Amino acid sequence: MTNEVRVRYAPSPTGYPHLGNIRTAMFNWLFARHNGGKFIVRIEDTDRERYVEGAVESILESLNWLGLDWDEGPDKGGDYGPYYQSERLPLYRKAAEKLVAEGKAYYCHCSSEKLDKMREDQIARKEPPGYDRCCRDMGLGQKEGAVIRFKIPLDGQTAFTDLIRGEVTFDNAKQDDFVILKSDGFPTYHLASVVDDHAMQISHVLRAEEWLPSTPKHLMLYKALGYTPPLYAHLPMILGPDRSKLSKRHGATSTIEYKQAGYLPETMVNFLSLLGWAYDDKTELFSREQLIEYFCLEKVSKTAAIFNYEKLDWMNGMYIRTLSAQDLACRAMPFLEKDVRIAASGHLNLDYTVKVMPLIQERAKKLNELAELCWFIYSDDISYDPALLIDKKLTKETSLSALKAANARLEALPNFDAASMEEHIRPLAAELELKPGQLFGMLRTASTGQQVAPPLFQTMEVLGRQRCLWRIAMAIARLSEMPFQRS
């Protein structure tokens, strides 16, 4: 093993990557970048029965979306490839047969039916389920359907120092003679990960806490194969708000679902970094560069992290507000295109969207909220109850007169910008003996069809003179058609 820091993210394509899985990838990436080391991606595709088509692509898409670039792995290559375990099968068989030849592993001929019955009987007797080692000393050879099991030492302990949890000790007698090579010639996770971590010169293994009980098995394999083991660090679990294991019932779990829901990659990197790590007890917003600079295992918690959806939304809103109008518009376009009102408006283009985004940037927490906040700035097909044009303290006649006066004042403006509009419309309210809010409210409804909308005059400036005057004229027509009220 070299002195260089080399870490790996080794997902199994048995499903689409969830946030806990990607958090592990990110901690490995941060550790590598902080230490000037290498981040390797290895696809552990040896479980053929549970293999999910498209999962590898989803894994790589998630990494690319978050900017977790890898130094070796799929699409990159490297000196220690191939980086798909299904392409490394001869290495695992060679290691397994070496262990058999040295008396450290053995062929097991027990059928699946026999093993199922064994497990049922053990459970009935309230014993821990496990293999009874009946083939351990029989000296059996290879045959169809046989597996290779590792010979666990029957006494003693296996201890190691976890870089997060400190000294950890396991009794060997409580370990099972686990399978290392299956009957189909594919290795189990235990053998494949050990063989590959050694072959790829992995210096540190940062993985989820759920793999902690497997560590003694791996250390025994390292010793039996004559390898030097890497250093281990087991990351804390991620729990839902109710402190149960994070699952679909808490909301989205697939990383790509968060992308589709309108979360920014910057947000996800920042947020996931705080699920088990903290720089101090108060700082919550970090740039990517700061995370790389500050990240260290000494500040990774031993206790489970709680996934807080409200905090995620808050953080995403904060990041949205830091974007330039151009950047936000580029990111918003795919979401706006999905809204039929906007798509059919004839106004959806990048230049126009750059003007729209500052109007709603402060209100959005996710990109998928943008369309609902601004569709009426694109679409002229706005409908509303004309009664909304009448302030509750005014009559229809007063409101109609006010709208006509405002329309005439706006039409006469030499410059149709927000400052000029406010400069002329605010005094008009006084002339009409109205409060500014009353006149502004009428204009807001007339120009947007909404009672709650982005800043009025800035919105009207983006709409432009022609569209604004047309919308106000339509409002006057609608109001005129209502029965007259008498005060």
Swiss-Prot record:
InterPro entries: aa-tRNA-synth_I_cd-bd, aa-tRNA-synth_I_codon-bd_sub2, aa-tRNA-synth_I_CS, aa_tRNA-synth_I_cd-bd_sf, Glu-tRNA-ligase_bac/mito, Glu/Gln-tRNA-synth, Glu/Gln-tRNA-synth_Ib_cat-dom, GluQ/Sye. Its EC number is 6.1.1.17. Binds 1 zinc ion per subunit. GO terms for molecular function: ATP binding; glutamate-tRNA ligase activity; tRNA binding; zinc ion binding. Signal peptide: none annotated. Zn(2+) binds at C108, C110, C135, D137. It holds the Pfam family Anticodon_2. A motif ('KMSKS' region) lies at residues 245-249. It catalyses: tRNA(Glu) + L-glutamate + ATP = L-glutamyl-tRNA(Glu) + AMP + diphosphate. Catalyzes the attachment of glutamate to tRNA(Glu) in a two-step reaction: glutamate is first activated by ATP to form Glu-AMP and then transferred to the acceptor end of tRNA(Glu). Belongs to the class-I aminoacyl-tRNA synthetase family. Glutamate--tRNA ligase type 1 subfamily. This is Glutamate--tRNA ligase. It comes from Dehalococcoides mccartyi (strain CBDB1).
